[in-house]
Amino acid sequence: MRSEKKNTGLAAGAVLIAILIIIQIGDSYCSELYDKIQSLFLMDLIMNPLNMSLEDATVMINSVAIPFYAISLISPVFRGMVDYLGKKKVLLINLLLYIPGLLLCMTTRKYIVFLIGNSLISLSTSVDIQYIYIASFIDEKKRATVRGILAAAAALSAASVPVIRKVAITGRPYDYARMYGIGIAITAFVAVIVFIFLPWDKKQTTPEKITQLPTCGNKRNSALIYLYIVIFAWGAGTSGIKFYNEPMITMRFKTDYIINRILFIQPLITIIINIASGIMGDRYQGEKQSVQMWLPPLFR
């Protein structure tokens, strides 16, 4: 009887992880589009209509886009809704919010409207409800490993973008819209999978109370200091890699084969890093195991 319950629990955990991987793949694909095909929509939305160079168009759109990034600040509101609506409902709302953003980016011929659509995509990306599922259902001894697997799935999805770009982009005006159409199809598929297979939340009868907040002065929470070091170290490296983005690669090499190859290789490196860091994180004993759950997804 005990072995049957154990096998049932393992099967349920495997199904949950598989669903989370599917969610992460769709999430990563949609979030990577802006960075991976930037030179393509810049050409059709800004360079050709305004007779600008790629350098000037990149500076312009990054400057104009700054106010639109503020919409990502709403993401804590979405996470807070989990306590009232439940994880599955918020996750479905989050997924469905992708579709109008992708649709705007696919159909518009105005870069301002394009940025509005991209801001909706950025908002959906920043919520990351799947990590709440890890904290709620995955054993604490395996959380970092699962988190590493999801990060690797995200990197693999990011690596698929230049592959799809090579097939879908033909050089015609606005053909980047196909990439967003694929994003709509992927998001709809993920939403159906979540709706059918992910269990609905049970009502919580006894609210949990926070008895003590982690501080650096508390020796039992000394992992928080380690967390700060890791965030700053990885943040510096991530910023450097993000700075070397698709428009800069395009300006440097100007060859589709080399551009797609670089965009493909970068995420593959993060797959190794994320899986290794997750496995090593679970080998630590004590409270250092929780550090991995505090880390935001890398190389989004």
Language-model region placement:
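Conserved MFS/SLC helix-loop-helix module at the cytosolic interface between two early adjacent transmembrane helices
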Residues: L73-M106
